[in-house]
Amino acid sequence: MKVLVIGLGSMGTRRIRLIQKTDPNVEIAGVDTQESRRQKVKDELGIDGFDDLRQAIDDFTPDAAFICTSPISHGAIALQCLKSGLNIFTEINLLNDWYDEALKTAKEKNCKMFLSSTFLYRKEIEYITKAVENKKVNYIYHSGQYLPDWHPWESYKNFFVSDKRTNACREILAIEFPWLIKAFGEITDVYSLKSKNTSLDVDFPDNYIIVLQHKNGNKGVFCQDIIARKGERKLEVYAEDLHLFWEGTPQSLSVYDFNDRKDISINLYDDVNKDNRYAANIIENAYQDEIKAFFNYLNGIEAPRHTFEEDGKILDLVSKIEGEE
């Protein structure tokens, strides 16, 4: 199989490394308008690059494309790839105004579309989803990290999270909602508070407190921000017969044994793959697992865990939360 990775920034290079690790037989080429990025990928990963997508498609003749550019450009790139007959894998999308046309084009061209939703491939999320099944629970969840610490090697003003249309809080909401809905159920009511509490040079709220009512009776409080100086994900779930804790890392999942009155650690990983440039709650395992899932999807072995149809509804929900007064 031949794969084109479009966008050779941090996510594109991560995907190349993990594709090489997943299946060394996959042929890879890259696309990026920045010569320095193409050269870095050539030097570090042995991957040739193009500066033009059309030329890359014509000359490399790929079977599939990984779209790893800024989310604001995903739509145009995805449509060009689909119209050229390529299966596509997109990183998280923060705009859904192109979804209907893409789904229609994919059907016409007999192409497959796969959307990254990395947390659905975390083993802890799989465990939590099963643990709360058929229970009525409440949960409290905080997901936050100070925006300048996201990419310490560059200014936050230099990438998409500073753009109001694809802002940092919108991204985190779009990352978290797919697994929150899969685990706790369809959302039927939402109430939110938001404000700007920092001196960050952004024109959007930097924190949200969101109350969620789920169709099955579950309720949650979701606190999301780009303020917390210690990047963290912290979840507490409780019911009459369950008390569960998770701090976003593979080592931090535990349940309370109410008979012995002590926390029991839940270890789900034989090996954890970590990139130390990122916060402790970001691990490589799930990124690789969703690449495997994409390849399996292309081979007819498994279906995506998150669809564009589902994601369209989630992005509409995020827009509603952003627009609430």
Where are these regions (language model features)?
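Conserved SAM-binding strand-loop segment of SAM-dependent methyltransferases
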Residues: 46-53
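C-terminal helix-rich "cap/oligomerization" subdomain common to oxidoreductases
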Residues: 64-67, 215, 281, 286-325
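N-terminal Rossmann-like dinucleotide-binding module
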Residues: 1-44
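Predominantly a Rossmann-like dinucleotide-binding segment in NAD(P)-dependent oxidoreductases
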Residues: 119-193, 198-201
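Beta-strand-loop-alpha-helix segment that lines the small-molecule cofactor/substrate pocket
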Residues: 64, 70-71, 75-120
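Short, Asp-centered acidic motifs that coordinate Mg2+ and/or phosphate
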Residues: 63-64, 138
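Contiguous beta-strand/loop segments that form the cofactor/metal-binding neighborhood of enzyme cores
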Residues: 171-254, 281, 288-301
